[in-house]
From Swiss-Prot:
Domain of life: Bacteria
Annotated protein name in UniProt: LL-diaminopimelate aminotransferase
Cofactor: pyridoxal 5'-phosphate
The entry's keywords: Aminotransferase, Pyridoxal phosphate, Transferase
Family statement drawn from the similarity comment of this UniProt entry: Belongs to the class-I pyridoxal-phosphate-dependent aminotransferase family. LL-diaminopimelate aminotransferase subfamily.
The encoding gene: dapL
Entry-linked Pfam families: Aminotran_1_2 (PF00155)
Subunit organization: Homodimer.
């Protein structure tokens, strides 16, 4: 008989953001016409930059003409985009990444979730807590964890991120093989310094481990001393894979374009302990299971690197950062401790003793504001909420005014 994958039965009942959507829908059904301001899921609200829209149109026009029509493209991405990425995102910052080390995809979520397929199921993973749920859930699906008990899965090295360590995880005390890091961080909005990141790179060399570095929010960094890429750190090319996305950088959440960097110098180890290159493994997986991002979308992504595109993308991110500042200042005024909102579009807020879901429900029902309960990101997120800056200035200001009234501040 056909049997299901038993590891799916270990997963908690549903994905965090599905739970949020259900609660919001139930509230709207019982309160028809209520005005909801969504500051929960990290989805952008402003239109694509004009430079990207124009390039998108040109790409579509090419597809409408037999002479310029394109069918299947290279699975790894068109050279015109890969070369721009290598030049503008890496070489310009002193990171020696070549275009053929870049794999264009339809999302960092897919890539961070899929990359674990390259590794043995008996490796030990190190996951920050709180963390973006996809990292952990995909490893549960693959069978790398034990059962879920007392808020955590067995067989996982959880790296607590709390106020005590400024929400930057400490190095593991035990041997781990695969390490997930995300900076600027989702959900806490915190950043990591170059010396802190260097310690992780050194650890990975010593432990023969691999770092999966999610840099989806690097476009929001304004402090020039902070690393935008792990490859700004000496030795990282041998022990790290990096994930980037145009979703938050240029508003591509509904357009879908991202990329993963797998340096040819990066090594993993076979069952006999011999070092082997990781690049051809991901190339094989990528080309077997993915047929490439559409040509017009890649042309739109290329436009991000034009003179006009750079200015428009920066203005877009600056607007969201201004929103984050409004949120953080408002929460400070209301007496809540918070981090993030600087070099990041997320603000991580201590609920002053409130349960995460209780705080979520209070803001939804009394203020009509949707946030994200911190407990959905892990055990260490209990008592916190995440508020996203991805909305219009007007709605963010309205949301803060409503919250102030609802909380009696």
């Amino acid at each position: 008989m056909i049997r299901s994958n038993p590891h799916y039965e270990k997963l908690r009942s549903s994905y965090l953001f599905s739970d949020i959507a259900k609660r919001v829908a139930a509230h709207q059904e019982s309160h028809p016409g209520v005005d909801i301001i969504r500051l929960g899921i990290g989805d952008v609200t402003h239109a694509l930059p004009d430079a990207c829209v124009a390039a998108f149109h040109r790409g579509v026009d090419e597809m409408a003409n037999d002479a310029t029509f394109r069918g299947y493209g290279p699975e790894q991405g068109y050279a015109f985009l890969r070369e721009k990425i290598a030049s503008e995102d890496f070489k310009a910052r002193g990171a020696d990444i070549d275009s053929d080390e870049i794999f264009v995809s339809d999302g960092a979520k897919c890539d961070t979730g899929n990359f674990q397929e390259l590794f043995s199921t008996d490796i030990r993973i190190a996951i920050p807590d709180p963390v973006y749920p996809v990292y952990l859930d995909t490893n549960v699906m693959a069978g790398r964890t034990g059962e879920f008990k007392d808020g955590r899965y067995g067989g996982v090295s959880y790296m607590d991120c709390t106020a005590e360590n400024n929400f930057v995880p400490d190095l593991p005390q035990e041997q781990v093989d695969l390490i997930y890091l995300c900076f600027p961080n989702n959900p806490t909005g915190t950043t990591i310094t170059k010396p802190e990141l260097k310690r992780w790179v050194d650890y990975a060399h010593e432990a023969k481990a691999l770092i999966l570095f999610d840099a989806a929010y690097e476009a929001f960094i304004r402090d020039d001393t902070l690393p935008r890429s792990i490859y700004e750190i000496e030795g990282a090319k041998e022990v790290a894979v990096e994930f980037r996305s145009f979703s938050k950088t240029a508003g591509f959440t509904g357009t879908r374009c991202a990329y993963t960097v797998v340096p040819k110098a990066c090594r993993v180890f076979d069952q006999k302990g011999a070092a082997i290159a990781l690049h051809p493994l991901w190339n094989r997986r990528h080309t077997t299971k993915f047929n490439g991002v559409s040509y017009p979308v890649q042309r739109a992504a290329e436009a991000v690197y034009s003179t006009e595109g750079k200015a428009q993308v920066k203005a877009l991110a600056d607007g969201y950062l201004d929103n984050a500042g409004i949120i953080r200042r408002a929460m400070d005024t209301m007496g809540f401790d918070c981090v993030g909102g600087i070099d990041s579009p997320y603000v991580w807020i201590n609920g002053n003793g409130r349960d995460s879901w209780a705080f979520f429900d209070l803001l939804l029902k009394k203020a009509g504001v949707v946030c994200t309960p911190g407990t959905g990101f892990g055990q260490c997120g209990e008592g916190y909420i995440r508020i996203s800056a991805f909305n219009s200035r007007e709605k963010v200001e309205t949301a803060m005014a409503r919250m102030k009234e609802a909380l009696g501040s």
